[in-house]
Amino acid sequence: MPPKCILFYKTAAADERLEAVLERESTAGRLELLGVSAEEQSMVPPARRALPFFAPAAIPGMAFDYAVVIEASAEEKRDRARSRVKRLLPPFLLRLHYKIAAWRFTRKKRRLWQSFDGWGKPIERQPDMALPERSPLGAWSIPAAKTIPARTFLLPGFRMDEYAALRTRGITFLSDNCWGGLMYHTLGMEMTSPFINMFVWTDDFIRLINDLPYYLSQPLVPEKLRERRGAAYPVVLLGDVRLHFNHVTTPDELTAFAEKWYRRRERMDMDTLLIESSFDTPENQAKYESGFAACPYPKLIFTPYPSEKYVYLSAFDENAARYKGDFSDCTRDCAKNDYPGKIPLDFLQTFLTRTAQLPEEEK
Protein backbone atom coordinates (compact mmCIF):
# COMPACT_ATOMS: atom_id res chain seq x y z
CA MET A 1 0.00 0.00 0.00
CA PRO A 2 1.40 3.44 -0.88
CA PRO A 3 1.84 5.94 1.98
CA LYS A 4 -1.24 8.08 2.66
CA CYS A 5 -0.26 11.76 2.60
CA ILE A 6 -1.86 15.09 3.44
CA LEU A 7 -0.48 18.28 1.89
CA PHE A 8 -0.11 20.99 4.54
CA TYR A 9 0.38 24.46 3.04
CA LYS A 10 2.12 27.04 5.25
CA THR A 11 2.71 29.38 2.32
CA ALA A 12 0.49 30.47 -0.55
CA ALA A 13 3.45 30.56 -2.97
CA ALA A 14 3.07 27.71 -5.46
CA ASP A 15 6.11 25.60 -6.41
CA GLU A 16 5.65 24.11 -9.86
CA ARG A 17 8.54 21.67 -9.41
CA LEU A 18 7.02 20.27 -6.22
CA GLU A 19 3.57 19.98 -7.75
CA ALA A 20 5.06 18.10 -10.71
CA VAL A 21 6.82 15.60 -8.43
CA LEU A 22 3.70 15.07 -6.32
CA GLU A 23 1.65 14.49 -9.45
CA ARG A 24 4.22 12.05 -10.83
CA GLU A 25 4.43 10.02 -7.61
CA SER A 26 0.66 10.00 -7.18
CA THR A 27 0.05 8.91 -10.78
CA ALA A 28 2.67 6.17 -10.42
CA GLY A 29 0.86 4.85 -7.34
CA ARG A 30 3.79 5.51 -5.01
CA LEU A 31 1.77 7.80 -2.74
CA GLU A 32 -1.90 8.48 -2.09
CA LEU A 33 -3.06 12.06 -1.58
CA LEU A 34 -5.83 12.10 1.02
CA GLY A 35 -6.37 15.86 0.93
CA VAL A 36 -4.97 19.24 1.86
CA SER A 37 -4.76 21.43 4.95
CA ALA A 38 -3.74 24.97 5.84
CA GLU A 39 -4.41 27.62 8.46
CA GLU A 40 -6.56 29.34 5.85
CA GLN A 41 -8.19 27.57 2.94
CA SER A 42 -7.14 30.41 0.63
CA MET A 43 -3.49 29.30 1.02
CA VAL A 44 -4.19 26.11 -0.94
CA PRO A 45 -3.13 26.50 -4.61
CA PRO A 46 -6.00 26.42 -7.11
CA ALA A 47 -4.69 23.19 -8.64
CA ARG A 48 -5.17 21.41 -5.29
CA ARG A 49 -8.54 22.81 -4.25
CA ALA A 50 -10.37 19.84 -5.75
CA LEU A 51 -8.91 17.67 -2.97
CA PRO A 52 -10.73 17.39 0.39
CA PHE A 53 -9.78 20.15 2.84
CA PHE A 54 -9.06 19.25 6.48
CA ALA A 55 -8.84 21.72 9.34
CA PRO A 56 -5.39 21.43 11.02
CA ALA A 57 -6.96 20.53 14.38
CA ALA A 58 -8.63 17.49 12.81
CA ILE A 59 -5.47 15.95 11.36
CA PRO A 60 -3.99 14.30 14.52
CA GLY A 61 -7.08 12.08 14.80
CA MET A 62 -6.91 10.95 11.18
CA ALA A 63 -5.35 7.81 9.72
CA PHE A 64 -2.45 8.96 7.54
CA ASP A 65 1.24 8.21 7.12
CA TYR A 66 2.81 11.60 6.38
CA ALA A 67 1.96 15.29 6.27
CA VAL A 68 3.93 16.98 3.49
CA VAL A 69 4.85 20.43 4.83
CA ILE A 70 5.00 23.13 2.17
CA GLU A 71 6.46 26.35 3.57
CA ALA A 72 8.73 29.22 2.61
CA SER A 73 12.42 28.31 2.59
CA ALA A 74 14.80 29.64 5.23
CA GLU A 75 16.40 31.82 2.56
CA GLU A 76 13.03 33.31 1.61
CA LYS A 77 12.24 34.03 5.26
CA ARG A 78 15.61 35.75 5.73
CA ASP A 79 15.15 37.75 2.54
CA ARG A 80 11.76 38.98 3.75
CA ALA A 81 13.21 40.01 7.11
CA ARG A 82 16.12 41.79 5.44
CA SER A 83 13.83 43.55 2.98
CA ARG A 84 11.91 45.06 5.89
CA VAL A 85 15.13 46.45 7.35
CA LYS A 86 16.34 47.63 3.93
CA ARG A 87 13.21 49.73 3.54
CA LEU A 88 14.16 51.60 6.71
CA LEU A 89 17.91 52.07 6.23
CA PRO A 90 20.18 53.12 3.35
CA PRO A 91 22.88 50.55 2.36
CA PHE A 92 25.80 52.04 4.33
CA LEU A 93 23.70 52.29 7.50
CA LEU A 94 22.42 48.76 6.93
CA ARG A 95 25.99 47.40 6.86
CA LEU A 96 26.81 49.38 10.00
CA HIS A 97 23.64 48.09 11.67
CA TYR A 98 24.63 44.45 11.09
CA LYS A 99 28.21 45.03 12.29
CA ILE A 100 27.07 46.72 15.51
CA ALA A 101 24.45 44.02 16.15
CA ALA A 102 27.05 41.26 15.68
CA TRP A 103 29.55 43.04 17.96
CA ARG A 104 26.97 43.50 20.72
CA PHE A 105 25.84 39.89 20.44
CA THR A 106 29.39 38.53 20.64
CA ARG A 107 30.35 40.81 23.54
CA LYS A 108 27.28 39.79 25.53
CA LYS A 109 27.88 36.07 24.96
CA ARG A 110 31.60 36.30 25.78
CA ARG A 111 30.81 37.83 29.19
CA LEU A 112 28.71 34.79 30.06
CA TRP A 113 31.73 32.51 29.65
CA GLN A 114 33.81 34.47 32.17
CA SER A 115 31.96 32.86 35.07
CA PHE A 116 31.92 29.34 33.57
CA ASP A 117 33.73 26.91 35.89
CA GLY A 118 33.23 23.70 33.91
CA TRP A 119 36.52 23.65 32.01
CA GLY A 120 38.25 20.28 32.39
CA LYS A 121 35.22 18.64 34.02
CA PRO A 122 33.12 15.94 32.30
CA ILE A 123 29.63 17.13 31.40
CA GLU A 124 27.19 14.99 33.32
CA ARG A 125 24.05 13.53 31.78
CA GLN A 126 20.81 15.41 32.43
CA PRO A 127 18.19 12.70 31.78
CA ASP A 128 15.37 14.84 33.16
CA MET A 129 16.19 17.84 30.98
CA ALA A 130 13.26 18.77 28.76
CA LEU A 131 14.42 19.07 25.16
CA PRO A 132 11.36 19.99 23.10
CA GLU A 133 10.83 18.10 19.87
CA ARG A 134 11.02 20.34 16.86
CA SER A 135 8.21 19.64 14.46
CA PRO A 136 7.09 21.97 11.66
CA LEU A 137 3.51 21.11 12.65
CA GLY A 138 4.03 20.91 16.40
CA ALA A 139 1.40 23.61 16.98
CA TRP A 140 -1.18 21.08 15.75
CA SER A 141 0.24 18.11 17.72
CA ILE A 142 1.59 16.43 14.60
CA PRO A 143 4.98 14.85 15.50
CA ALA A 144 8.07 15.30 13.35
CA ALA A 145 8.08 11.55 12.63
CA LYS A 146 4.90 12.03 10.59
CA THR A 147 6.05 15.04 8.56
CA ILE A 148 8.05 15.34 5.35
CA PRO A 149 9.40 18.74 4.24
CA ALA A 150 8.56 19.69 0.68
CA ARG A 151 12.28 20.17 -0.07
CA THR A 152 12.78 16.39 0.20
CA PHE A 153 10.60 15.81 -2.86
CA LEU A 154 12.95 18.04 -4.90
CA LEU A 155 15.99 15.79 -4.40
CA PRO A 156 17.38 14.36 -7.65
CA GLY A 157 15.83 11.01 -8.49
CA PHE A 158 13.29 11.19 -5.66
CA ARG A 159 10.89 8.23 -5.42
CA MET A 160 8.41 8.00 -2.58
CA ASP A 161 8.78 4.23 -2.17
CA GLU A 162 12.57 4.48 -1.79
CA TYR A 163 12.28 7.43 0.56
CA ALA A 164 9.70 5.65 2.74
CA ALA A 165 12.06 2.66 2.96
CA LEU A 166 14.91 4.99 3.94
CA ARG A 167 12.75 6.56 6.67
CA THR A 168 11.94 3.09 7.99
CA ARG A 169 15.54 1.90 7.97
CA GLY A 170 17.19 5.16 9.01
CA ILE A 171 20.73 6.33 8.34
CA THR A 172 23.50 7.50 10.67
CA PHE A 173 25.63 10.27 9.18
CA LEU A 174 29.03 10.88 10.76
CA SER A 175 30.52 13.99 9.19
CA ASP A 176 33.49 16.17 10.06
CA ASN A 177 31.40 19.34 9.62
CA CYS A 178 27.78 20.47 9.26
CA TRP A 179 27.14 18.20 6.26
CA GLY A 180 25.40 15.47 8.27
CA GLY A 181 23.01 17.85 10.01
CA LEU A 182 22.14 19.49 6.71
CA MET A 183 21.42 16.09 5.15
CA TYR A 184 19.05 15.18 8.00
CA HIS A 185 17.34 18.55 7.51
CA THR A 186 16.99 18.05 3.76
CA LEU A 187 15.70 14.51 4.20
CA GLY A 188 13.37 15.48 7.05
CA MET A 189 14.64 12.55 9.12
CA GLU A 190 15.38 12.03 12.79
CA MET A 191 18.98 12.83 13.72
CA THR A 192 20.47 9.51 14.78
CA SER A 193 24.01 10.87 15.03
CA PRO A 194 25.51 13.11 17.73
CA PHE A 195 27.91 14.73 15.26
CA ILE A 196 25.58 17.60 14.39
CA ASN A 197 26.27 21.37 14.37
CA MET A 198 30.01 21.02 14.98
CA PHE A 199 33.24 20.40 13.12
CA VAL A 200 36.33 18.25 13.68
CA TRP A 201 39.80 18.82 12.21
CA THR A 202 40.88 16.03 9.85
CA ASP A 203 43.66 14.57 12.06
CA ASP A 204 41.22 14.23 14.95
CA PHE A 205 38.48 12.92 12.67
CA ILE A 206 40.66 10.08 11.38
CA ARG A 207 41.53 8.98 14.92
CA LEU A 208 37.83 9.13 15.80
CA ILE A 209 36.50 6.99 12.94
CA ASN A 210 39.26 4.39 13.29
CA ASP A 211 38.45 3.73 16.95
CA LEU A 212 34.80 4.76 17.08
CA PRO A 213 33.54 2.42 19.87
CA TYR A 214 36.22 3.75 22.22
CA TYR A 215 35.54 7.41 21.53
CA LEU A 216 31.77 6.98 21.77
CA SER A 217 32.27 5.60 25.28
CA GLN A 218 34.04 8.78 26.43
CA PRO A 219 32.37 11.73 28.21
CA LEU A 220 32.36 15.26 26.84
CA VAL A 221 34.90 17.48 28.62
CA PRO A 222 34.98 21.26 27.87
CA GLU A 223 38.59 22.23 27.19
CA LYS A 224 38.70 25.91 26.24
CA LEU A 225 36.96 28.83 24.55
CA ARG A 226 38.05 29.48 20.97
CA GLU A 227 37.81 32.73 19.05
CA ARG A 228 36.89 32.32 15.38
CA ARG A 229 35.64 34.89 12.89
CA GLY A 230 34.73 37.33 15.63
CA ALA A 231 32.77 34.76 17.66
CA ALA A 232 33.63 32.58 20.65
CA TYR A 233 32.62 28.94 21.12
CA PRO A 234 33.70 26.00 23.32
CA VAL A 235 36.12 23.30 22.21
CA VAL A 236 35.12 20.02 23.86
CA LEU A 237 37.29 16.93 24.31
CA LEU A 238 36.06 13.44 23.48
CA GLY A 239 39.01 11.46 24.73
CA ASP A 240 41.87 13.16 22.87
CA VAL A 241 39.64 14.27 19.98
CA ARG A 242 38.61 17.92 19.88
CA LEU A 243 35.02 18.67 18.91
CA HIS A 244 34.39 22.29 17.90
CA PHE A 245 30.88 23.25 19.06
CA ASN A 246 30.83 26.35 16.87
CA HIS A 247 27.04 26.82 17.13
CA VAL A 248 27.14 26.99 20.95
CA THR A 249 27.34 30.54 22.33
CA THR A 250 26.60 30.28 26.09
CA PRO A 251 27.25 27.85 28.98
CA ASP A 252 23.54 27.04 29.21
CA GLU A 253 23.50 26.20 25.51
CA LEU A 254 26.51 23.93 26.07
CA THR A 255 24.65 21.97 28.76
CA ALA A 256 21.62 21.46 26.51
CA PHE A 257 23.79 20.71 23.47
CA ALA A 258 25.76 18.09 25.40
CA GLU A 259 22.55 16.37 26.52
CA LYS A 260 21.39 16.28 22.90
CA TRP A 261 24.78 14.80 22.01
CA TYR A 262 24.41 12.00 24.57
CA ARG A 263 20.83 11.21 23.54
CA ARG A 264 21.69 11.13 19.84
CA ARG A 265 24.66 8.89 20.61
CA GLU A 266 22.21 6.36 22.06
CA ARG A 267 20.22 6.43 18.79
CA MET A 268 23.22 5.59 16.60
CA ASP A 269 22.85 2.50 14.41
CA MET A 270 26.25 1.22 13.33
CA ASP A 271 24.60 -0.91 10.63
CA THR A 272 23.46 2.24 8.80
CA LEU A 273 26.58 4.33 9.47
CA LEU A 274 27.99 6.54 6.70
CA ILE A 275 31.25 8.48 7.14
CA GLU A 276 31.39 11.75 5.15
CA SER A 277 34.43 13.93 4.51
CA SER A 278 36.33 15.59 1.67
CA PHE A 279 39.78 16.13 0.18
CA ASP A 280 40.06 19.74 -0.96
CA THR A 281 43.47 19.26 -2.62
CA PRO A 282 45.47 16.31 -4.03
CA GLU A 283 48.06 17.05 -1.34
CA ASN A 284 45.50 16.51 1.42
CA GLN A 285 44.33 13.34 -0.30
CA ALA A 286 47.91 12.01 -0.25
CA LYS A 287 48.28 13.00 3.40
CA TYR A 288 45.04 11.56 4.76
CA GLU A 289 43.94 8.86 2.31
CA SER A 290 45.51 5.96 4.20
CA GLY A 291 43.78 7.02 7.41
CA PHE A 292 40.38 6.99 5.74
CA ALA A 293 41.16 3.70 3.96
CA ALA A 294 41.77 2.01 7.33
CA CYS A 295 38.30 3.01 8.55
CA PRO A 296 36.01 -0.08 8.44
CA TYR A 297 32.76 1.83 7.77
CA PRO A 298 31.18 2.95 4.46
CA LYS A 299 32.60 6.29 3.36
CA LEU A 300 31.50 9.16 1.14
CA ILE A 301 34.37 11.48 0.19
CA PHE A 302 34.06 14.53 -2.07
CA THR A 303 36.82 16.14 -4.14
CA PRO A 304 36.99 19.33 -6.28
CA TYR A 305 39.10 17.50 -8.90
CA PRO A 306 38.45 14.40 -11.05
CA SER A 307 38.83 11.15 -9.14
CA GLU A 308 38.00 7.53 -9.91
CA LYS A 309 37.51 6.63 -6.24
CA TYR A 310 35.72 9.67 -4.84
CA VAL A 311 32.82 11.97 -5.70
CA TYR A 312 33.98 14.79 -7.98
CA LEU A 313 32.08 18.08 -7.60
CA SER A 314 32.88 19.86 -10.85
CA ALA A 315 30.71 22.88 -9.98
CA PHE A 316 33.32 24.05 -7.44
CA ASP A 317 35.66 25.36 -10.14
CA GLU A 318 32.79 26.31 -12.44
CA ASN A 319 31.40 28.61 -9.72
CA ALA A 320 34.62 30.08 -8.31
CA ALA A 321 33.02 33.44 -7.52
CA ARG A 322 30.35 31.72 -5.43
CA TYR A 323 32.64 29.51 -3.34
CA LYS A 324 35.75 31.72 -3.12
CA GLY A 325 38.04 28.74 -2.56
CA ASP A 326 35.98 27.16 0.26
CA PHE A 327 35.26 23.59 -0.87
CA SER A 328 33.31 22.80 2.31
CA ASP A 329 30.66 25.30 1.16
CA CYS A 330 30.30 23.29 -2.04
CA THR A 331 29.83 19.98 -0.20
CA ARG A 332 27.28 21.60 2.12
CA ASP A 333 25.34 22.83 -0.92
CA CYS A 334 25.01 19.19 -1.96
CA ALA A 335 23.51 18.39 1.43
CA LYS A 336 21.11 21.35 1.11
CA ASN A 337 20.18 20.32 -2.45
CA ASP A 338 21.45 23.73 -3.56
CA TYR A 339 24.38 22.44 -5.63
CA PRO A 340 24.74 24.52 -8.84
CA GLY A 341 25.09 21.51 -11.10
CA LYS A 342 24.10 17.87 -11.44
CA ILE A 343 24.75 16.07 -8.16
CA PRO A 344 26.84 13.01 -9.13
CA LEU A 345 25.32 10.80 -6.46
CA ASP A 346 21.85 9.56 -5.60
CA PHE A 347 21.71 10.05 -1.82
CA LEU A 348 18.46 8.13 -1.46
CA GLN A 349 19.54 4.90 -3.13
CA THR A 350 23.27 4.34 -2.81
CA PHE A 351 23.38 3.54 0.90
CA LEU A 352 19.84 2.29 1.32
CA THR A 353 20.51 -0.57 -1.10
CA ARG A 354 24.22 -1.00 -0.34
CA THR A 355 23.90 -4.28 1.56
CA ALA A 356 21.62 -5.79 -1.07
CA GLN A 357 24.15 -4.90 -3.79
CA LEU A 358 27.19 -6.44 -2.07
CA PRO A 359 28.36 -9.91 -3.12
CA GLU A 360 27.40 -12.56 -0.58
CA GLU A 361 30.96 -12.98 0.71
CA GLU A 362 31.20 -9.22 1.47
CA LYS A 363 27.94 -8.91 3.42
Residue ranges, per PLM feature:
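Membrane-proximal basic amphipathic "stem/tether" segments
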Residues: 8-9, 78-120, 127-128, 135-164
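Structural motif
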Residues: 7-13, 36-39, 69-74, 126, ...
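Short, charged/polar "capping" segments at the starts of alpha-helices
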Residues: 13-18, 39-45, 75-80, 102, ...
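A generic structural motif
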Residues: 31-41, 52-55, 96-99, 122-133, ...
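Acidic/glycine-enriched edge-of-secondary-structure segments
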Residues: 5-7, 36-50, 70-72, 231-256
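A solvent-exposed beta-alpha-beta segment
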Residues: 4-66, 298-300
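C-terminal regions of proteins
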Residues: 309-355
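Positively charged, amphipathic N-terminal segments that serve as targeting/anchoring signals
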Residues: 156-169, 174-278, 283-284, 314-319, ...
